[in-house]
Design a protein with these regions (language model features):
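Glycine- and small/polar-enriched repetitive beta-structure motifs of secreted/surface proteins
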Residues: 1-217
Length: 217
């Protein structure tokens, strides 16, 4: 184990032989870890609430900051996955958040891949989302199984009840205005950017379906 910084890995039970290969660098980095293996924690307050966890990577101030019992999460960036698992000891697994505030509001969601600043920043209990690009899918809270790739893709999608959206938006501003529509495939810059509540649409090409706001199928 390697601990560098005030209170880094300060709670780790080194008398237990299995607690090995942990690295924590920064003030209070991994400060609450009692049982853990192969965690890499770098940054002030990074994973500072984690008690039991394995093979997590947290890099950046307050990255994975409130996770208590998760494993195999990757959080890179200021407050990335910052509130994951807050208030619960139930384990949350396999989330990837890379970029400032990426997935910062996730509490119990799992298997999300969020790459880019502000990506999926409002998601809480949501699963299986793939989000790449600055500000992509930033307002949705409970939507699952969305794919948003590109600057501000699915920018306004927001399901306030648990919903499998199955929306796919790829391109600059693709699906920009979609709020509660489902099963849409929008590929190309500004594709379906005016669509709001329409469902079951396919739009491929620059500005395809860019003036329809409510249409379905």
């Amino acid at each position: 184990n390697v601990a560098i910084g005030r209170d880094a890995l300060s709670a780790l039970n080194i008398a237990t032989a299995a607690n090995t290969y942990n690295t924590a660098v920064g003030s209070s980095a991994g400060a609450a870890v009692t049982t853990g293996v192969e965690n890499t924690i770098m940054g002030g307050l990074a994973a500072d609430a984690l008690t039991v966890g394995y093979q997590n990577v947290a890099m950046g101030y307050n990255a994975l900051g409130t996770e208590q019992g998760g494993s195999r999460n990757i959080a890179i960036g200021v407050a990335a996955l910052g509130t994951q698992n807050i208030g619960t000891t139930a384990a949350t697994h396999y989330n990837v958040g890379v970029g400032a505030l990426s997935g910062t509001a996730i509490t119990t969601g799992s298997r999300n891949t969020l790459i880019g600043g502000l990506t999926g920043m409002a998601l809480t209990d949501a699963d299986y989302n793939v989000v790449l690009g600055y500000n992509a899918l930033p307002t949705d809270t409970l939507g699952s199984r969305s794919t948003a790739i590109g600057y501000s893709a699915l920018n306004n999608q927001n399901f306030t009840t648990a919903t499998d959206s199955y929306n796919t938006a790829v391109g600059f501003y693709a699906g920009l205005s979609v709020t509660t529509g489902i099963n849409n495939t929008l590929i190309g810059g500004l594709a379906g950017d005016a669509l709001t509540t329409g469902s079951n649409n396919v739009a491929v090409g620059e500005e395809a379906l860019s003036t329809d706001d409510l249409g379905s199928k």
